[in-house]
């Protein structure tokens, strides 16, 4: 029997880049692709590419990779000090976060990571296995509709913390649908 081993450091990079992609998409950015590779001369082992964002990248997208990586390593409960320590390694993310000057960014990012943890983990598994994921794969992990108006509502529901956005509720066998929080 073949025993498969997992490189946890490379899987952490896949989680990191998947979180940038998923949270970026939730915040309205268009993901081109996310890739992981051997570390380059700057120590980067992956990247997430977005189409041009006229207003820039939201600060929660910059912090998402670090927060998801810590969530992967320590579970949902980790200290703000752990984030500060990790941002010492992820200097690009730290520079973007410091430039935003918003003290509420960490709380918003943690909530988004918890809300979208399943899609992040699913996308990270694909990224770890194949080394690259597309924007379409990000949308598939988020289970977004192919129709723009529906996907816009779904993304808004995710930002609001309701995941999934709607489920069928059939009291007495009727065909009623209503939005509810899960």
Tell where the protein language model's regions lie, with residue ranges.
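Soluble catalytic regions of large protease machineries
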Residues: 2-182
């Amino acid at each position: 029997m073949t025993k498969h081993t997992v490189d946890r450091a490379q899987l952490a990079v896949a989680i990191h880049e998947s979180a940038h992609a998923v949270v970026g998409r939730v915040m309205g950015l268009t993901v081109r692709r996310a890739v992981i590779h051997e570390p380059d001369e700057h120590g980067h082992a992956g990247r997430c590419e977005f189409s041009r964002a006229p207003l820039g990248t939201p600060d929660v997208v910059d912090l998402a990779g670090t927060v998801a990586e810590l969530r992967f390593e320590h579970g949902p409960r980790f200290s703000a000090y752990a984030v500060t320590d990790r941002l010492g390694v992820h200097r690009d993310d730290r520079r973007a976060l410091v430039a935003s000057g918003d003290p509420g960014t960490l709380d918003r990012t943690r909530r988004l990571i918890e809300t979208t943890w399943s899609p992040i983990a699913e996308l990270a598994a694909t990224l770890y296995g194949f080394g690259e994921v597309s924007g379409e794969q990000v949308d598939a992990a988020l289970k977004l509709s192919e129709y723009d108006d529906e996907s816009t509502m779904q993304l808004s529901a995710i930002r609001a913390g309701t995941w999934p956005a709607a489920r069928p509720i059939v009291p007495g066998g009727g065909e009623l649908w209503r939005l509810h929080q899960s």
